[in-house]
């Protein structure tokens, strides 16, 4: 990370896409996408997804590391080009507990991530706990971040410290996605970004963390990009001009969250304006969902009814029977909720792919289609971009390859934004 930031600060148009997903096909897609380049691949886990208690994935930080390393080994991706990051590391998961208890767990969270070899650590203590006022005083936020930083510094060995980096600050949206419809987005004011940096500098120095300050590479801000279930707020560079100008006077860059679904040109403009770390998550699993839905349509055309996977029906049954991951996010009317379940940009379906019934039906879908030849006309009908790539000779039409390539459509847009002189 330090090299990428240094090159950006030296004037090179360079950024990095942060892949925020625990889905094995998404991770495989990202690693295969840069397998034959010299690029680093940044893969991040969030605190609610992976923590010392297992998170909603059931993985602790060391488990997630081994999970990613296992996929890397399968595809031949070198570990030295992998960067593992932890996002929103702090009291996020324990906001309903008193601050003292939540911070105690947050310290253990940080230790677990650093001990597992995660080198990009987002210190986020911005959320109020059960006995806190709302919002928290910025100095309290910074001092809590310093406590977390001290835990990281105390856990890392000297070799790890060569690569260890920190991200501070937070964006407006809650981790995990918007729960309601958005109308507009508040762009972070440069004075607030400056205050975030100043308070963290004071707090770190109070705690004897002067050396750790040199490892702070980025500040999380809101540049004016967001999405909800049905709409996207696109980047407007003119609205963030003052914010972009301020960061130039510091040794840091910005990290932008929720950049999913922006245009290729928007990613390029964001990196130009020093939002050099672009986080993406739901757009990747949305592309995965599109690919599986497309393959299900092909299966309906090619496989006899009694042998089909029924994957779309199984997804509906599971999500309707177990609505915990989508109920409070989607519209209450049944017909509208079904549209959201299938097609929402926030892609709450991503939480259900590990479900045993859904996983088995997806496996059967792929097995069924592996046993037949996929007609080019059928691929053109349901996956036209992949049809073009087949015609160009850069893709072989297996179900697995079609899914991977569909996910990589998203990554191609980020590469355009993050890389100098790309077509």
From Swiss-Prot:
One BP term from GO:
phosphoenolpyruvate-dependent sugar phosphotransferase system
What domain of life? Bacteria
Decide whether keyword Nucleotidyltransferase is in the record.
no
- Listed Gene3D superfamilies: Aldolase class I, putative tagatose 6-phosphate kinase domain like
The pathway is: Carbohydrate metabolism; D-tagatose 6-phosphate degradation; D-glyceraldehyde 3-phosphate and glycerone phosphate from D-tagatose 6-phosphate: step 2/2
Identify one Gene Ontology CC term for this UniProt entry.
Answer: plasma membrane
Which family would the database say this protein is a member of?
Answer: Belongs to the GatZ/KbaZ family. GatZ subfamily.
Task: Provide the assembly information.
Answer: Forms a complex with GatY.
Q: What is this protein called?
A: D-tagatose-1,6-bisphosphate aldolase subunit GatZ
Annotated source species: Salmonella typhimurium (strain LT2 / SGSC1412 / ATCC 700720)
